């Protein structure tokens, strides 16, 4: 392959990846990485790259794709072998699979991903792993007014979504951002206007609703292509204000669902007032969800669409675009909503809570990650629910159970007292406690405590201390509580063995000796958490940040800093 062909290959690949426009710097980087000996001739190479990129950018996206498929199909094919995940083999078979699938996950970056949005991401990627093919990440961000992409000094939803997907172990083959593809949408609506499959509607919204509900045509429906193209140009020039003109797709005016009748494909959004975070006020005429999705699904070669049941009407609307262009529509599988018992997955409600998107009390993926939920647990949950047309309601306890079985073997045991009281008692003998780091993995070691004979001072849970009662100090001894005076509990050694404790029904309680102060942050409800300060074993100082532990008789936690822990679940 000569140099010009190599440049053409990378220019086409870059253009297809980014909506039809190649970038000189990106192509140069690819060339220099593959042929480093060309670096001394970078100036001459750049001139060639600029010329080829200009030629490629003058082509339509369809032409770019055709050339790439004809000459370098390997750039569009599966490029890596990935490990199958447990549970994928149990997924229901997809219809009409021909040697692989091309699927997409298409989030709106107006908020971060949560447990509900993890479902389409995981299911689509799981089928990509099951059959081979391609997984596309597509940001659907063409509504800068009502669903404005979330980009602030604190959060960039585009980046956060990418991070969440990487955390889930999802690797996308291609990425697209719809707001960067506006010229492509303009090109295609112009074709529909030319062939009389769409028209510019100047009716007032209330007038249109009356006509639509009556199944009658708008007076602008019969405009000639020339008239529509002129009105379209006026829309692009800013000659109309918001709400004064829209472009409609011709459908069936007698369709039983009024929303399907001549739905809006383009509308005017005054981006001088609500600028888009990526393209600012460059565009004022924006495609609706259904139009942009239809064009992209075709151009990106999507074979199967897996999405929520709530999109079933959108599938019908999009079918008209495919019919007008004579394209084959992807196979669409709808699944029910995923509901979390006692927790809302509504973006608006989560935003309204007023806490950071990655707060451990939220069911966002960032929040669950910070809380200590493992991505493998989320995968198992989603694959277990699978692709069902009916809604599924699960409790967070289901997710916690799946997470627990993964962290239980790696979480060493430690003692912690949330609301401590000092316990003082005397022993006439030496007491010995051997506490293993993990009862199932004795080889990890143990802590050995020796006390007495004499006065012994420990800290125990206040709620377990009642005068006259006997308590079993875990792995140590049985103590009878005599009195509580001035905030200190006093007792006497009752016995040592576990059998004696059972005979008197003594509860087993944790205790700490020469403790350190421990800070625990605990989620108590969606958007709410509490912080408690307790006492823990000094051995907790040696636990690495990020490690999981189990506080006995308390729950599983994740260390997030010196003496700081996050409560994961019980």
Curated annotation (Swiss-Prot):
Does Cytoplasm show up as a keyword for this record? Answer: yes
Q: Name one GO cellular component term.
A: cytosol
Catalyses: tRNA(Glu) + L-glutamate + ATP = L-glutamyl-tRNA(Glu) + AMP + diphosphate
**Keyword Metal-binding found:** no
- In the Enzyme Commission scheme, what number(s) does this protein have? 6.1.1.17
Please give the NCBIfam families that the UniProt record associates with this protein: gltX_arch, PRK04156.1
* Full protein name: Glutamate--tRNA ligase
């Amino acid at each position: 392959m000569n140099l010009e062909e190599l440049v053409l290959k990378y220019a086409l690949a870059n253009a297809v990846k980014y909506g039809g426009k190649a970038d000189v710097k990106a192509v140069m980087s690819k060339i220099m990485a593959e042929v480093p000996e060309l670096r001394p001739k970078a100036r001459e190479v750049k001139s060639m790259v600029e010329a080829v990129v200009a030629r490629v950018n003058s082509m339509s996206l369809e032409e770019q794709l055709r050339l790439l498929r004809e000459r370098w199909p390997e750039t569009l094919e599966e490029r890596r072998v990935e490990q199958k995940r447990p549970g994928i083999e149990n997924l229901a078979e997809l219809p009409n699979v021909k040697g692989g699938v091309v699927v997409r996950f298409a989030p709106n970056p107006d908020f971060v991903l949560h447990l509900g949005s993890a479902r389409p991401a995981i299911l689509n990627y799981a089928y990509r792993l099951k059959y081979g093919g391609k997984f596309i990440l597509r940001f659907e961000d063409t509504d800068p007014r009502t669903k404005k992409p979330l980009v602030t000094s604190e959060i960039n939803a585009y980046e956060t979504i990418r991070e969440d997907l990487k955390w889930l172990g999802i690797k996308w083959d291609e990425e697209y951002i719809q707001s960067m593809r506006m010229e492509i949408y303009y090109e295609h609506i112009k074709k529909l206007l030319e062939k009389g499959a769409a028209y510019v509607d100047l009716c007032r919204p209330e007038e249109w609703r009356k006509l639509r509900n009556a199944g009658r045509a708008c007076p602008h429906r019969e405009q000639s292509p020339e008239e529509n193209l002129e009105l379209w140009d006026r829309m692009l020039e800013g000659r109309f204000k918001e709400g004064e003109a829209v472009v409609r797709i011709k459908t069936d005016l007698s369709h039983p669902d009024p929303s399907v009748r001549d739905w809006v494909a383009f509308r005017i959004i005054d981006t001088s007032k609500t600028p888009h975070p990526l393209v600012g006020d460059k565009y004022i005429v924006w495609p609706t969800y259904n139009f942009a999705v239809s064009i992209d699904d075709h151009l990106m070669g999507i074979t199967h669409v897996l999405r929520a049941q709530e999109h079933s009407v959108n599938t019908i609307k999009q079918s008209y675009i495919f019919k007008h262009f004579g394209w084959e529509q992807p196979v669409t599988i709808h699944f029910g909503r995923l509901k979390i018992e006692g927790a809302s997955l509504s973006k608006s409600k989560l935003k309204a809570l007023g806490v950071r998107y990655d707060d451990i009390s939220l069911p966002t993926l960032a929040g669950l990650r910070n809380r200590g939920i493992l991505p493998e647990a989320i995968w198992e949950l989603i694959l277990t629910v699978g692709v069902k047309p009916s809604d599924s309601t699960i409790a967070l306890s289901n997710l916690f159970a799946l997470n627990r079985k993964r962290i239980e073997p790696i979480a060493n045991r430690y003692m912690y007292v949330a609301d401590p009281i000092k316990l003082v008692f005397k022993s006439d003998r030496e007491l010995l406690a051997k506490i293993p780091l993990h009862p199932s993995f004795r080889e990890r070691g143990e802590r050995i405590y020796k006390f007495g004979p004499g006065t012994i001072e420990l800290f125990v849970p206040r709620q377990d201390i009642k005068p006259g009662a006997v308590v079993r100090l875990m792995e140590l001894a049985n103590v009878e509580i005599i009195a509580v005076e001035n905030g200190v509990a006093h007792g006497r050694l009752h016995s040592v063995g576990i059998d004696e404790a059972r005979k008197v029904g003594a509860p087993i309680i944790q205790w700490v000796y020469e403790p350190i102060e421990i800070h625990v942050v605990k989620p108590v409800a969606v958007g709410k958490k509490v912080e408690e300060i307790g006492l823990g074993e000094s051995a907790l100082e040696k636990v690495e940040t990020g490690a999981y532990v189990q506080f006995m008789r308390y729950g599983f936690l994740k260390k997030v800093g010196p003496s700081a822990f996050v409560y994961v679940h019980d």
